[in-house]
Amino acid sequence: MPKLDLAKVPVRTGTRYPPPYDVPCRDRHRLQLGDGGGLSQFGVNLLTLKPGVWSSQRHWHRKEDEFVYILSGEVVLITDAGEEAMKAGDCAAFPANDGNGHHLVNRSNADAMLLEVGTRSGGDS
């Protein structure tokens, strides 16, 4: 497949969470790189979190592995172990069915950009 034209890659802004759970994730912005490249086995997203925005509600996946790499800015990773600051160059992995809920929160004053990679196993959101 040739180089992706980022202007043609699908973008998803906001969330599918119902109120009031949608509020902290409302301004997240996902450039769906995997979809733009026709990938079917795993998803790849370029996620931008503005200050105060969450990546998601805290969650874990039964069937899907998930990986995040911080490209720029700073976020706070929240898991069962507590809170951990992450900056550009840091990464985290979330194996399927580990039961440790996670999410990322941008508590800084600048945008944060992350690369998300995850299995597409269906029926596991």
Predicted features along the sequence, with ranges:
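A short, N-terminal "cap"/entry segment at the start of jelly-roll beta-barrel domains
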Residues: 1-41
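Conserved short histidine dyad/triad with adjacent acidic residue
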Residues: 27-30, 45-61, 99
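Short, conserved, surface-exposed binding loops centered on an aromatic residue
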Residues: 35-38, 48, 59-61, 67-68, ...
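Short, conserved beta-strand element in jelly-roll/cupin
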Residues: 46-50, 61-79, 117-121
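Short, charged/polar surface micro-motifs in flexible loops or helix N-caps
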Residues: 50-54, 74, 83, 98, ...
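Short beta-strand His + acidic residue motifs that chelate non-heme Fe in jelly-roll/DSBH
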Residues: 57, 77-78, 94, 101-107
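Short acidic-glycine-tyrosine-enriched beta hairpin
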Residues: 80-97
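Double-stranded beta-helix
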Residues: 105-125
